[in-house]
Amino acid sequence: MTKAASGDTKSTLYCSFCGKSQHEVRKLIAGPTVFICDECVELCMDIIREEHKIAFVKSKDGVPTPREICEVLDDYVIGQNHAKKVLAVAVHNHYKRLNHASKNNDVELAKSNILLVGPTGTGKTLLAQTLARIIDVPFTMADATTLTEAGYVGEDVENIVLKLLQAADYNVERAQRGIVYIDEIDKISRKSDNPSITRDVSGEGVQQALLKIMEGTVASVPPQGGRKHPQQEFLQVDTTNILFICGGAFAGLERIISARGQGKSIGFGAKVADPEERRTGEILRGVEPDDLQRFGLIPEFIGRLPVIATLEDLDEAALVKILTEPKNAFVKQYQRLFEMENIGLTFTEDALHGVAKKAILRKTGARGLRSIMEGILLETMFELPNYEGVEEVVVNAEVVEGRAQPLLIYAEKKGGAASA
């Protein structure tokens, strides 16, 4: 370790971890041969608290309770309290069922796979990923749009099991307790209300192919992936205890639900509902299996997904929280990038609301926040390594609206009114 400071109290002291001087931090704590600043202490405490919370959930005998699962989900996903409760209960019951499967019971507990329904960018994928991290089981994601029936060009459904096996480092026992998330499940809906006359290998055909592995079967998986060959050796993976979570935006499903609710009323006395009166997420909460069938999912496939969790639209306040509060919040990520150049980054409150409003107008949910931030900071990040004497970059509402450039605050102007 290089010497951060000499024994002379008049010399400038530096944090041994981040390298900041005593003038750049609020407190500098001295040890026998090292110094640590208050910012590094705070960062260490955050890491310890996070590790302690995850360890607490994992170390308890049996399975984490739904409340414990929700508490950890709250650190990563903003809002969606109803969906969190549904998922927490379903996951808790699933792994409780596995832990008690060896005991002799007259009642056999069935597996409850989960369907996540919600507008794009509301956190469906993040919820599934975080659940797998909490339970500490192998996790894999698949895109339903790439799947086809066996024998056709495309990805075989059994390749999903192979991906899970790879995530478990080819430990079959661990893979058989894992979680599979299938995204864009609404894109494999049947193309018409009538049963297919011609073969629908990427829609109804994929639903049929998924039935067995979702319910429980012994899948023969080629270790190297790809198509099966008669001379090949296969790994046998039982999918009975693998939890399948399927997610999709189901664009247009709200119209099917609304039409069912309104019935067939016509005439002067009929109530004409304003489509803006109720938000999409609110309407989706009333989804029933018949609505999914009308959308294009076959009854057998719907039956394999008994637990349905619906996600709400994200309003402006929720999007602002997503920008700043989660562990991996976008603002924190960009602040870390700027810190690498020893420059601070500040977003004013009105700037954050401006970013949120843009995302709502684009109808991209939380997923669109990053592209908006990237556009705002592009020129600044291009010049960032060349800045000399700049101590802080401030983004306000005018910058978000494209009417101004970010404010640059220089070190020598820190004492007075900062301007650029």
Curated annotation (Swiss-Prot):
Gene Ontology biological process: cell division; proteolysis involved in protein catabolic process
GO function terms (MF aspect): ATP binding; ATP hydrolysis activity; ATP-dependent protein folding chaperone; protein dimerization activity; unfolded protein binding; zinc ion binding
ClpX-type ZB domain segment(s): 3-56
Residues engaged in binding Zn(2+): C15, C18, C37, C40
S-adenosyl-L-methionine found in the keyword field: no
SMART domains with a match to the protein in the record: AAA, ClpB_D2-small, zf-C4_ClpX
Binding positions (ATP): P119, T120, G121, T122, G123, K124, T125, L126
UniProt similarity note: Belongs to the ClpX chaperone family.
Assembly notes: Component of the ClpX-ClpP complex. Forms a hexameric ring that, in the presence of ATP, binds to fourteen ClpP subunits assembled into a disk-like structure with a central cavity, resembling the structure of eukaryotic proteasomes.
Name this protein carries in UniProt: ATP-dependent Clp protease ATP-binding subunit ClpX
